[in-house]
């Protein structure tokens, strides 16, 4: 199945992106597997338009203290950051609205909390091997989250309120099996998006252009010049 054509088709049908307001936000959550199909790159995922997300931003810095450490001389500064805070939002009336804030001392603790706060416990109607059986989180992370994943003090932190991560609640998706070319739908009972979404038709691929051999002239340059002179 042509993955890019499928994404384009969903957009054209109002099932994904800015035209999918009837189902959720314009955010597009795609997990793309490239390269040969294997157990490490078997599926690609196109999530249904999300209806809930959580945004994590760089907190206000504490009072700065001159750091005398020198990691290049085996003198790293060991430290633990404060609370990591996420703002849970819901899509409504054409925009994202803040619902609540949740905090945790580490990234994994925060994700467990978001799992309880954001996700519907209703199971998916269909089950696909290797995939969760109910809604799950998918996200995009900045490298600066190392402040909460490693016990080191970062000397040059991002600016206050810089975006660190976004977590989306995936309560429906179209899965594409690269080995078989088949598609599978993950959805909860009564999801109108899953009832209408249809994989796009295969893109027509033109065959290779046939290279014709160059035409050979029966007249060389000298004969061509003689012919011109004869006309004069």
Regions found by a protein language model. Give the residues of each.
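Extended accessory regions or peripheral subdomains of proteins
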Residues: 1-103, 140-232
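Short acidic (Asp/Glu) patches
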Residues: 104-126, 150-161
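A short acidic-Thr-Gly-centered motif at the start of a beta-strand
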Residues: 121-130, 226-232
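C-terminal interaction segments
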Residues: 128-141
């Amino acid at each position: 199945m042509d993955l890019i054509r499928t994404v384009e088709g969903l957009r054209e049908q109002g099932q994904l992106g800015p035209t999918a307001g009837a189902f959720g936000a314009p955010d597009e959550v795609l997990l793309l597997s490239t390269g040969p199909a294997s157990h490490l790159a078997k599926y690609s995922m196109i999530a249904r338009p999300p209806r809930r997300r959580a945004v994590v931003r760089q907190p206000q810095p504490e009072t700065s203290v001159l750091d005398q450490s020198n990691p290049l001389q085996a003198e790293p500064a060991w430290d633990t950051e404060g609370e990591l805070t996420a703002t849970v939002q819901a899509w409504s009336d054409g925009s994202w609205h803040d619902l609540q804030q949740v905090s945790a001392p580490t990234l994994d603790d925060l994700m467990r909390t978001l799992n309880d706060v954001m996700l519907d416990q209703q199971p998916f109607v269909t089950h696909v091997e290797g995939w969760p059986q109910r809604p799950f989180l998918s996200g995009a992370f900045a490298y600066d989250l190392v402040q909460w994943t490693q016990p080191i003090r970062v000397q040059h932190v991002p600016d206050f309120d810089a975006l660190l991560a976004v977590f989306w609640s995936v309560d429906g998706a179209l899965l594409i099996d690269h080995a078989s070319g088949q598609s599978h739908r993950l959805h909860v009972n009564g999801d109108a998006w899953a009832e209408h979404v249809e994989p796009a038709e295969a893109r027509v691929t033109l065959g290779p252009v046939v290279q014709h051999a160059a035409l050979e002239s029966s007249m060389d340059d000298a004969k061509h010049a003689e012919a011109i002179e004869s006309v004069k």
